[in-house]
């Protein structure tokens, strides 16, 4: 607790501050005035010194209060005695009557005077305490009318004044006792409230805010700050140092409250994912990828014992599906993707939800373009690949040829000395499916996949749609924690409360553990595939976070992430953001692809290497742009052009495409960009033309051209080209540009002007002066 001041101690023990100061000086305490502070030992000694005195003063106050209550009792007795006195006082009334009979002229007046004297003496007996007969007789002998009437009025006035004064005194004393009692009872309550052990504050608090936390009045906080040398009012903001000094003066600790940005759900997601407490093994999440019609959906159909192929248009998967398969008392979660766009979009948003990739390759068709793309997608995501060679039941199946083809993409079978698992299957007849599941579980054991189910659920969106009957429907994959029905949730830029939760078989469930795909309802809007979701403790916080994220997204309009280009490549390398440059190569023939790839791999600048993530023959298509956008790569086209759709998508996603027809130019461009030597390209833009109307000669200036702007405009900083009969005679800069006698910066079409060409005078009437500027454009 803080040190107590003298005036505070004086109030508590009910003595004056001067007495405490005098006693403190006797004991040798260093005090100066009533604001001086006392230590605990000094306070204890002074309390002991004034303890008997405080008791005596209390007894005196109690004793002084008793006579005030006894004063009222004699009044009641005297009032009774007054009544008796009035009855006895009626007997001598006849004496004044006899006197008035002897004085016939003053008969009536004498009776009035005697009656008034009776009232006066009765009043005197009532308030004075006793009656005197001699006084009554002497007053009764007065025969003057004026004196008798005046004496009656005075007696009534005196009696009323005394009654009024007594009532006022009694009322004042009663109110004073009530006030003293209330002060005695209410004063210690506020002072006895304990201070908090720690003052949790935020920068910018005022005295009122601190008073509520410290259980003190605002005036006390302002006074204490004043004694500490800080002059503020109760509404003025305080900085961190002042608040900490105040807390130190009170003898408590100060701790600044850390404000958490609830809109940054990625921070909550990472924190939940990093929680290693209560970890337990979880099911692996497996993505099935491959070329169209190679049997991806048929394989998954056999795994989950349902037939979805017949219900889909043309046998092609129309939406992402997530299903769980139970095998050998273990669970495997499978994701079936419609092509690779959704997988890439999820990876582009940072949703690394896949643990293992199963690459399905038909034994009769071999490696196809989408197979190669699937390999590059999986490698870019950093997931291990298990190759399922399908359709081995067909007559033309050649699994060995598939293995030979995949060795070109660094997928070497274990039998051949590599580390890639190959399984020959027949999805149609279910051959070797169990062996494939065994290999998946074996790979998951190697990865040691674990998660904490005893926390709030977090995960990613697999797919989302708007249902007419249900509203927003989202398929979620729980990656950490447990998701319950009724949980307040934020999904991307949407929010809500989990109203219903359905598993892949259409059954309602109440909770979902890690690696479990579920379909939920209750969101206010439709999220996007790859968005993360986080469960909050209360719906109010979830709503605030979701609304703020939606507002930010609306303002920024889903601003595109700036990807690496050759123009900013050197800056990215210099800032240490990149250790390698990802490149996609597309060429007209395979020989050009191999030559360009080999030359680019030999470039070595400051320890940064070129990483070719995809190379193929053919035009640059949308799939190439999607892969480049997800991998932050540069596309190099050799003797090929992008399709219109790919060009539009590249412009939208800010993907850099470089086109060349000379292989060494492509190599030099990449190398110079990595070294920071790539110079900008300039483009000429003609802004105006001037027709020469007249020529003037000045000895100090030279040839002055008088003309008119026939097209565009001319600026004083323009470069000019003198054209005579369609032939360029001279190129240079303007020396000066005037209109009448004033120097101007610009002259527009239809206006006359005067100009000079720097270091050139051979200008003739009828010549055309062309004005142009050089603009910097990025190299494409």
From Swiss-Prot:
Basic residues composition bias: which ranges?
159-176
**A GO-annotated cellular component:** cytosol
Where is the protein localized?
A: Cytoplasm
Residue numbers spanned by region G1:
290-297
Query: Which parts of this chain are annotated as the region G5?
Result: 426-428
* Matches recorded under SUPFAM superfamilies: Initiation factor IF2/eIF5b, domain 3, P-loop containing nucleoside triphosphate hydrolases, Translation proteins
Region G4, as annotated, extends over: 390-393
Q: Where is the composition biased (Basic and acidic residues)?
A: 177-194
Q: Give the GO molecular function terms.
A: GTP binding; GTPase activity; translation initiation factor activity
Q: What is its main location?
A: cytoplasm
Give start-end positions of Low complexity composition bias.
98-114, 132-158
State the residue spans of region: Disordered: 24-194
Span of domain tr-type G: 281-450
Please list the residues that bind GTP. Answer: 290-297, 336-340, 390-393
Q: List every stretch annotated G2.
A: 315-319
Q: Where is this region: G3?
A: 336-339
Q: Which UniProt keywords apply?
A: Cytoplasm, GTP-binding, Initiation factor, Nucleotide-binding, Protein biosynthesis
State the source organism's domain of life: Bacteria
Q: Compositional bias (Polar residues) at which positions?
A: 59-71, 80-90
The entry's family comment says: Belongs to the TRAFAC class translation factor GTPase superfamily. Classic translation factor GTPase family. IF-2 subfamily.
Role, per record: One of the essential components for the initiation of protein synthesis. Protects formylmethionyl-tRNA from spontaneous hydrolysis and promotes its binding to the 30S ribosomal subunits. Also involved in the hydrolysis of GTP during the formation of the 70S ribosomal complex.
Q: What is this protein called?
A: Translation initiation factor IF-2
What species is this protein from?
Levilactobacillus brevis (strain ATCC 367 / BCRC 12310 / CIP 105137 / JCM 1170 / LMG 11437 / NCIMB 947 / NCTC 947) (Lactobacillus brevis)
